[in-house]
Amino acid sequence: MRVLILDMVHGGDLLAMRHLAEGDDVTCVDVYGICPQSRKEELRSMEIRVADSVPEGRYDVTVMPKHCPMSFLGDAEPGQVVTFSQDVNRFIEDSRFRIEVTGVKGKTSACYLIAKMLHDSGRRVLLHTSRGEGPWTDEGHLIERKVSIAPPYLMTLAAGDYDAVVCEVSLGGSGKADIACITNLVEDYGIARNTFKASEAKRDIFTDRGRNIVLRDEVPFWSQYCKDLIPYGGRVKVASPPRLGEGPRVVVDYDGESEVVLDGSYIATEYLGAMDLALEVCHSMGVPRESVLESLRSFRGVPGRGEILEEDGRKVIRERNPGISHISIGRTLECLREMDALDGAMIILDPVSRRVCDKMDRDQIQAVVDSYGVPMVVTNGDGVRPEVPGNVSLLIEFIKEGYQ
């Protein structure tokens, strides 16, 4: 078959090699123009055609990520068009117990909580997120490599005798997970130059061989794509007014209600949805009640996600995340307002990006920030930190970076 593959940044090169191994005539296109030249030469040495724009001609199959607009095809005749997720579904061979998590917000947090809860219950866990990939240990996530969370990288997960592999996925999934989760669809944003919606890509995560878990309020929407859904939500409720730097008391419904005091080193109320999802996953796997409760008590948050620090005599909130947007910023500010913590606050927004695809909407972010009455400074992304006035008692840093 003549196979055309678009996008060499999000794993198209991996799929190209799989098709080549099957004897296909493969053309791979660097549509974003940022694939390293060394990688292109490596593929050419394997007799894979590499181009910077789509060559004209007729193809039997075209493989492209859902976020690529069809206009990239130009005058080519694509034949059957399949997404990266659908192609991964065809090729993936990993038989280890796998949990895949996609969604708009909270993916990394949910994956960290799931990994910790499973590890604390005695399981060996590999964690693959936008922060990196590696085993979960008694000290937390041991990151051994930085790697994309695009669907094709599910085919290159680290080897090892793990009881569970927990994977964050950007858009879609393999369709073959043992447990597939969608955190939420708080914004069904446009992709592929607004020719598709994010939900059209994320729905590819639904598995035909395991359990599918979605937010309870979103069951009516997702049921058009998957009939056998497990709803999550409502297992964790705040029982005391949150205060900055103090762990809130929460009531956890997991085989009966229990009161738990969360750690105060991170904004725990930002994590309530992720906690709900992690508890639902663990309940479906039969993780003991006391084990998950202790995991919640000892969880310290994801590094760089709602961290509460003390620097230069002031408190600092640090959000380092590829998913920084007006929605995530609004959520952080709302949590801080609930703590009466915004007096004397200032925001630094750093748009530095390390292989991050989602662009920030400056106007939307400014409107959200203005609604909370907090001054904001936007950096040039050059690593130069702006001067912080001495009367600022709380510095909130939003840094958009990570691996997608």
Q: Model-flagged regions — what are they?
A:
Residues M1-E100, S121:
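Short, basic phosphate-binding NTP loop
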Residues L6, F196, I230-I329:
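Adenine nucleotide phosphate-binding catalytic loops in nucleotide-utilizing enzymes
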Residues D24-D25, S38-D52, Y59-T62, D75-T83, ...:
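Active-site regions of enzymes building and remodeling cell-envelope glycoconjugates
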Residues V147-S223:
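Flexible active-site lid/hinge loop adjacent to a nucleotide/diphosphate
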